[in-house]
């Protein structure tokens, strides 16, 4: 788990080949936030195929409104109503380790697609088209990992030093961790928004966020 030396080298290759929109000095300086790389033991769990949609959010919050979404099948985003949603859901948030494990789907590259620069056409924010959703799935059958800013159970700590070796969330006071967000900035403005699609990219929650529910494996 974390941003590896090989992944940093892959970003440098993209930059040297004029694949970056701007100087990536700030990205490399902030890479410490996703390091050091460590091995994490992740127990089996269930995770939603994609973030909650507007229609799904209204199942739990009937009064939910979303001025950002274009349709009921679009990703729902929460801000002031996040705590209400989490109180109503019979599920939990993924830990940060679970989220990255799900996003990587067995890979160690920048995204599950490889070390190439992600394109904006890989962003998925609406799930009405089953064919398009299926084509966006990773090897675990998960779609839109990295497209929306997705909140995790962990509190934000700007590094992985002394982080647990299992997938438990790190707790405490302060904002939570968010992962992804490439679609929240669409249409892209040439500001290297593609970096938000990387499996290892992490940040602290500031405004609205999407939710991808998680549940334990059922017992027999």
For each feature predicted by the language model, list its residue ranges.
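Active-site microenvironments of metalloenzymes and redox enzymes
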Residues: 2-118, 155-157, 216-219
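Small-residue (glycine/proline)-centered packing/hinge motifs flanked by hydrophobic/aromatic residues
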Residues: 15, 25, 189, 193-200
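Short Gly/Pro-enriched turn/cap motifs at secondary-structure boundaries
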Residues: 36-37, 130-134, 200-205
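Functional-site microenvironments in short loops/helix caps that host divalent-cation chemistry
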Residues: 66-195, 207
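Short secondary-structure boundary/capping segments
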Residues: 32, 37-39, 167-170, 202-203
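Short, structured beta-strand segments at or near domain termini in extracellular proteins/domains
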Residues: 206-220
């Amino acid at each position: 788990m974390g941003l590896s030396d090989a992944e940093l080298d892959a970003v440098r290759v993209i930059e040297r080949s004029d694949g970056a929109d701007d100087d990536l000095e700030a990205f490399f300086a902030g890479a410490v936030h996703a390091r050091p790389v460590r091995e994490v033991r992740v127990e089996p769990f269930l995770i939603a195929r994609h973030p909650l949609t507007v229609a799904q959010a209204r199942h739990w919050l009937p009064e939910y409104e979303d001025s950002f979404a274009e349709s009921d099948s679009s990703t729902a985003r929460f801000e002031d109503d996040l705590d209400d949603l989490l109180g109503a859901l019979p599920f939990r948030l993924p830990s940060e380790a679970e989220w990255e494990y799900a996003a990587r789907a067995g890979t160690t590259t920048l995204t599950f697609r490889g070390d190439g620069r992600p394109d904006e056409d890989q962003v998925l924010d609406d799930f009405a088209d089953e064919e398009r959703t299926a084509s966006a799935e990773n090897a675990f059958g998960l779609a839109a990992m990295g497209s929306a800013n997705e909140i995790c159970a962990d509190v934000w700590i700007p590094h992985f030093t002394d982080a647990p070796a299992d997938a438990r969330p790190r707790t405490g006071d302060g904002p939570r961790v968010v992962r992804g967000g490439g679609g929240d900035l669409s249409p892209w403005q040439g500001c290297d928004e593609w970096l938000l699609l990387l499996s290892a990219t992490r940040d602290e929650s500031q405004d609205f966020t999407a939710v991808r529910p998680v549940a334990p494996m059922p017992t027999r």
